[in-house]
Swiss-Prot record:
Homooligomer; homooligomerization is required for activity. Residues 1-29 form the signal peptide. Changing residue 132 to S: Abolished ability to promote cell death without affecting homooligomerization. Changing residue 101 to C: Abolished ability to promote cell death without affecting homooligomerization. The TIR domain mediates NAD(+) hydrolase (NADase) activity. Self-association of TIR domains is required for NADase activity. The TIR domain alone is active and (slowly) produces 2'cADPR. This is Disease resistance protein L6. The record marks 131 as: Important for ADPR cyclization. Changing residue 130 to A: Reduced ability to promote cell death without affecting homooligomerization. The lineage of its organism: Eukaryota, Viridiplantae, Streptophyta, Embryophyta, Tracheophyta.
């Protein structure tokens, strides 16, 4: 009991610190403002220390700008803010007009509290503003409370000495304040100014180039925050100074050569920590930096392309989804052309023998001099293969004895040294740990606050492991010291729940009496698990491997172990009925689409967790699986003709998850009976796969769930009746896309503990009655009733944070915590709250001050027009809350204009879709949206002009990144004229789409394209372009990656397109121009990978020299592909479809000239001879092949070239005349085989015994192959791997 009391005490003491277990590093430089001479210089804000510090809880902003608007808003502050945005640094910019009342508002306080770096711009009038002084005092206070925060002042045309001593203009300001504020307040303000004046910062004089200084400030700020993800705990830094010094020496930072350093050592020795510390120390010396962790796991799971995209996105500061390549060769090309030109630092953490530097990054010689690469691995042999690239090796060895003792003491005693009476024991323990940091931390945490006897027992166990080479047995000592319940939780996480949210496992563990609340904290204290920001479980890979090894060592036979996480072992256990009472948990993570009969579960009396994707259960389950707690069968399918599931009486079930399922059998395949019998259920998630099967699953009669349920979620399930009468414990109720005839047993108002209720797109006869008293639910935070037309709510719960509804909201002004509001298809419309001219507390929007997102869809907006001289007969100025960051208005019939949007200075995204149906007018107000980043306007009838767009684009603070305008038939003007003047540049614009606006005068916008120098994606489907030179402006877009150009018949003068040599980054080109005859200069586009030509009915020839992917379709007059035989050796993807005049025979015969081709599609082309296809057998790199022919190719009866395509993974053949396919059995890599529509096919393999050779086959579709014999089909069932999903000519195979 004393041990438990100590644990409880430790929990109470450590819980606040556990919850803040990530730390962030501040700058450590001294002030550059010299106290002696009062001079200043620009700061070199680069941390050269590895001293740790923590991360901030709930950080929202990276930078907080404090300034006096009249002094700097239109000058330096805008320069700086725009520069910070270009660096994608999330910045809070304060304005005087945001401040109201006598104190700093809660929103501003929250912004200060949730920022990491403060940048006060101290100007001559800064102290004149009480708001600025209040802000500065609060900033200083927060920084003093938390030294991790950084203050980087900017002295704007003022003397820092005046700031420090409050002389000059500041003395006058404080004289004025002295008459209005008490002495203590004045002193606090002076102290804040003095502290900031003492700090180093930037000094801006009259003749300084403010834009250049703003960029310098941004770059230095970025050097701070770019290290944020390299978090190092205090204890991680113990003992690594020698490692850092050694690695820095090998990196030879003064050398002009590209240098690689490989760190190797056993798991848990500190390789990653050393790499992070070196990264933190030197990253500021490089143009760009990137740290990629978990290489081994990521490459095995997702492939090298994911790693390449992460590298490119980190270095270029772009979204990984827009990097412009989808295969490893494209990644290497992008890295060579766009990344290698920077001086970069790249850390590749935890590589194994599968990693090849050249496969991911290309040759090190491609990178600019002084670039550096750090690679970590457990194996010296793996790094030894890099020696040809002059990789310098360094072994990260064990910690020294003094450092080991220090690290151990931090965990065992919460101090740097042991107490005198524990000193001998502590030294003895350290001697047994071999200087392994992970072991020292785990064992130290184990012994924290333990009695001497426990220390002595642990020491004896450690001494028994002295001769072991691996960390397993040392770490296992900490595992052995856990209580039995904590052991079960630890092994469950290691085997099944890493990366998963903790909520549902808690239910299972609670029912098993594992006490998860206390034991999870206990495991965190012991450094054995972590819980992430999203409540997901995390675990060091060494501890994960140890946990799984513990399970493996339980028995040499998998079916005699407690947990099975291998699909192969799980399938073998069930199909061969090898179950035993030792098995507690089984997971079959990937789909097997197989039937498991009840006898497969014999002897599994202790099984408590079963997860099997696409499996089906049949038979009599009476007295089977009595202890099952968790049953999860995603993509479960049970039809009317399938064997039934009977006597499913698992009374101890806690969690049932049947998502993406399709159950059509009577009594729902036995599941309804199970629901009745499972009296202890806590979580039920049922969802039919409506998108796949096109219809909902039906639950007949009245369904009653056990009264124990706390989470009930049903999606796309049709029900006669649901009884909620006894579900008093519900916390979450989701009934989405569920037609319900009746909800019985009471009303939702009686569910007092309900936190989330979703009734989206539901309808039923009494839905209105059961929601009538929902306003009583004080605990409800999320309510979604959109599409539920029968729902009418007179009063919404006051504590809501998120509301989606199709009902009127009579008490909107009382929803003070509301952050997200969506109104969809409300028949009564949405009553736009009137705003008072003074915007005082009588305004509804002023009260709902936390609202961030407003979506009005398919709803009439009810407004009152103010008819007076000041309003001009329009709506009040402040009609929408200024807190909004996202506004979407879709198919809202009124009003016929958007009032008040010019005031939405925080708005980042505006979507307008189909709302101007009755308007013959304009959209105005864009000029005021200074934070706007995304603008989408689609299908807006009656919209003639977009006013304010030019003013927005010409603003020096313009942040617009993406602009889409489509399907606006009445639009005649975007810009009244092209953007002129040398100073007008919109560097933020990255994507521009203009489509289907037939009356639009697009010329001014096209001629303005050079003003968008960073434009990466351009999509133009426009009319009325009559001159080829009108398109010349596109050629100036040097950053362009993707270009789509579609012109109609009104642009008949466009017969030739000349590709500019400046488009060196263009990877994708899509052209749809009927009048086009020729494209010149394609050979100049060195990065072009994908070329799509569709509807170019006049096109006659193509020069294709550097192409990676060619897709040609719908070009009936195309007859020739020039130079294809010798000029496209780099081609990787080729698609030809619907080109009847193209001589495809010569093209096919030239395919051997494309040695890198890995994807080939020939669809609806004219092939008349079988021997024309033989050449395909020479394409040894081919990964995917699709051959689709129609009845005109009736001579193709046999395919015999496949046996040489050993890398082929996907084969799609649709040839009606085909009778035989040779060589399929030799395709060892084949995973997907589609033969749909091969109506004459008689057999797949000459020898049925060869079927078993396709070990990797996952999908076989032979639907439509009506000529296959019964014997052939029977052989398929018995010889193909169990995982293979087969679609038969008439029905799916189980």
């Amino acid at each position: 009991m004393s041990y438990l009391r100590e644990v409880a005490t430790a929990v109470a003491l450590l819980l606040p610190f556990i919850l803040l277990n990530k730390f962030w590093r501040p700058n450590s430089k001294d002030s550059i403002v010299n106290d002696d001479d009062d001079s200043t210089s620009e700061v070199d804000a680069i941390s050269d220390s590895t001293n740790p510090s923590g991360s901030f809880p709930s950080v929202e902003y990276e930078v907080f700008l404090s300034f006096r608007g009249p002094d700097t808003r239109e000058q330096f502050t805008d320069f700086l803010y725009q520069s910070l945005r270009r660096y994608k640094i999330h910045t809070f910019r304060d304005d005087d007009e945001l401040l109201k009342g006598k104190e700093i508002g809660p929103n501003l306080l929250r912004a200060i509290d949730q920022s990491k770096i403060y940048v006060p711009i101290i100007s001559s009038g800064y102290a004149d503003s009480k708001w600025c002084l209040m802000e500065l005092a609060e900033i200083v206070r927060r920084q003093e409370e938390d030294p991790r925060r950084i203050i980087l002042p900017i002295f704007y045309m003022v003397d820092p000495s005046d700031v420090r001593h409050q002389t000059g203009c500041y003395k006058k300001a404080f004289r004025k304040h002295a008459n209005k504020f008490d002495g203590q307040t004045i002193q606090n303000w002076k102290d804040a100014l003095k502290k900031v004046g003492d700090l180093k910062g930037w000094h801006i004089g009259k003749n300084d180039k403010q834009g250049a200084i703003a960029d310098k400030v941004s770059a230095d700020i970025w050097s701070h925050i770019s290290k944020e993800n390299l978090i190092l705990e205090t204890d991680e830094l113990v003992g690594i100074d020698d490692h850092i010094t050694a690695v820095l020496e090998k990196l030879s930072l003064d050398s002009e050569n590209v240098t690689m350093v490989g760190l190797y050592g056993m798991g848990g020795i500190g390789k990653t920590t050393t790499a992070k510390a070196v990264y933190n120390k030197i990253s500021s010396c490089f143009d760009c930096c990137c740290f990629i962790d978990n290489i081994r796991e990521t490459q095995e799971k997702d492939g090298v392309v994911v790693l390449q995209k992460k590298l490119v996105s980190e270095i270029l500061r772009i979204d990984s989804g827009s990097v412009g390549f989808n295969n490893d060769s494209g990644g290497r090309k992008t890295i060579k052309e766009r990344v290698s030109r920077f001086k970069i630092l790249v850390v590749l953490d935890d590589v194994d023998e599968k990693f090849k530097f050249e496969d991911m990054l290309g040759s090190p010689k491609d990178f600019i001099s002084q670039s550096r690469f750090i690679i970590t691995s457990r194996s010296m042999r793996v790094l030894g293969t890099l020696n040809e690239n002059q990789c310098k090796l360094y072994e990260v060895g064990s910690m020294s004895k003094p450092r080991s003792l220090e690290l151990f003491s931090k965990h065992a005693f919460k101090k740097n040294t042991p107490p005198s009476y524990y000193e001998t024991l502590a030294n003895d323990v350290v001697d047994t740990t071999a200087g392994l940091p992970l072991t020292l931390k785990v064992i130290g945490s184990l012994l924290f606050k333990q009695e001497i006897a426990v220390w002595e027992d642990t020491l004896e166990q450690l001494r028994r492991t002295l001769n072991l080479d691996e960390v397993y047995d040392r770490l296992k000592i900490s595992y052995d010291a856990l209580n039995p319940e904590a052991k079960e939780i630890f092994l469950d996480i290691a085997c099944f729940f890493i990366g998963q949210n903790k909520e549902e496992p808690y239910y299972m563990w609670t029912d098993c009496n594992f006490y998860p609340a206390s034991n999870i904290i206990f495991l965190i204290q012991r450094c054995m698990i972590q819980v992430g920001d999203d409540d997901e479980f995390k675990m060091h890979d060494q501890l994960r491997d140890m946990g799984r090894e513990i399970v493996r060592r339980e028995d040499v036979l998998p079916w005699k172990r407690s947990r099975i996480w291998s699909a192969e072992e799980g399938i073998d256990l069930l199909l061969n009925k090898k179950g035993s009472s030792k098995v507690k948990a089984i997971s079959i993570p990937w789909g097997v689409k197989y039937e498991f009969k009840s006898e497969c579960f014999l002897n599994l009396s202790e099984l408590r967790y079963l997860h099997a994707r696409e499996a089906m259960l049949t038979g009599d389950f009476n007295n089977l699986l009595p202890n099952l707690k968790w049953l999860e069968l995603p993509f479960y399918k049970h039809g009317e003709d399938d064997p039934p599931l009977t006597n499913y009486t698992m009374k101890n079930l806690i969690i049932v998850i049947l998502e993406h399922s399709h159950i059509t059998a009577d009594d729902w395949g036995g599941w309804r009976h199970m629901m009745k019998m499972a009296e202890r259920l806590k979580v039920v998630r049922l969802a039919s796969n409506y998108s796949l099967y096109g219809r909902r699953v039906r639950l007949s009669d009245c369904w009653r769930f056990p009264k124990s349920i706390e989470v009930l979620s049903m999606t796309a399930i049709e029900m006669d009746e649901v009884d909620i009468g006894e579900l008093k414990k519900l916390k979450t109720l989701v009934l989405k896309f569920c037609p319900i005839q009746k909800i019985s047993g009471g009303t939702f108002g009686m569910l007092k503990g309900l936190r989330e209720l979703c009734l989206e797109f539901n309808w039923g006869t009494n839905l209105r009655e059961v929601v009538a008293d929902i306003g009583q639910l004080s605990s409800l935070k999320v309510l979604k009733t959109t599409g539920a037309k029968e729902v009418e709510i007179n009063e919404f719960p006051l504590g809501l944070k998120e509301l989606s509804t199709s009902s009127r909201i009579p008490n909107l002004s009382q929803l003070l915590d509301l952050e997200v509001l969506k109104v969809y298809d409300c028949k009564d419309g949405f009553d736009m709250p009137p705003a008072s001219p003074s915007e005082d507390e009588s305004s509804v929007w002023w009260k709902v001050s936390k609202l961030k997102s407003l979506q009005l869809e398919k709803t009439r907006i009810n407004v009152n027009v103010v008819d007076d001289a000041s309003s001009g007969g329009h709506l009040p100025r402040y009609l929408l809350p200024t807190s909004l960051t996202y506004l979407k208005i879709y198919q809202c019939t009124e009003p016929t204009w958007l009032p008040g949007i010019e005031n939405l200075e925080n708005l980042t995204s505006l979507e307008v879709n189909d709302i101007f149906q009755t308007l013959g007018g304009d959209l105005d107000g864009l000029q005021g949206l200074r934070s706007l980043e995304i603008l989408r306007i689609r299908k807006v009838n009656g919209l003639a002009r977009i006013k304010g767009l030019k003013d927005l684009l010409c603003s020096s603070t313009c942040k617009l990144r993406k602009f889409y305008i489509t399907e606006c038939p009445d639009l005649i003007e975007l810009l009244p004229c092209e953007l002129g003047g040398q100073t007008v540049v919109v560097p933020s614009m990255a994507e521009l789409t203009i489509r289907d606006c037939p009356r639009l005068e697009v010329g001014p916008m096209i001629r303005s394209l050079p003003k968008f120098p960073m434009l990466k994606k351009l999509d133009l489907a426009v009319a009325n372009i009559t001159k080829e030179e009108d398109l010349d402006a596109i050629g100036s877009l040097e950053e362009l990656v993707s270009l789509e150009l579609e012109l109609d018949d009104t642009s008949s003068g466009i017969e030739r397109i000349v590709s500019s040599s400046k488009l060196q980054k263009l990877t994708t080109l899509v052209v749809k121009v009927p009048s086009l005859r020729e494209i010149e200069g394609l050979e100049e586009l060195k990065s072009l990978q994908d070329l799509y030509l569709e509807g170019c009915t006049s096109l006659g020839r193509l020069p294709l020299e550097k192409l990676k992917e060619l897709d040609i379709g719908g070009c009936p007059d195309l007859t020739e592909l020039v130079q294809t035989v010798v000029a496209v050796p780099s081609l990787r993807g080729l698609t030809i479809r619907d080109c009847p005049r193209l001589e495809v025979g010569p093209m096919i015969q030239s395919l051997p000239k494309f040695p890198m081709l890995n994807e080939l599609t020939l669809s609806m082309v004219n092939i008349t001879k079988e021997d024309e296809l033989e050449v395909l057998g020479s394409l040894e790199e081919l990964d995917s092949l699709e051959l689709t022919l129609d009845d005109t190719c009736s001579s193709i009866e046999r395919i015999s070239f496949l046996s040489k395509l050993q890398k082929l993974t996907t084969l799609i053949v649709e040839v009606p005349s085909l009778r035989e396919i040779e060589g399929l059995a030799e395709l060892k890599s084949l995973r997907i085989l589609y033969l749909e529509g091969c109506t004459s096919l008689e057999r797949l393999w000459p020898d049925q015994q060869q079927l078993g050779s396709l070990k990797n086959l996952n999908v076989l579709d032979i639907q439509g192959c009506k000529s296959l014999s019964v014997d052939h089909l029977s052989a398929l069932k018995t010889t193909l791997p169990p995982r293979a999903r087969i679609t038969w000519p008439d029905q799916p195979y189980r």
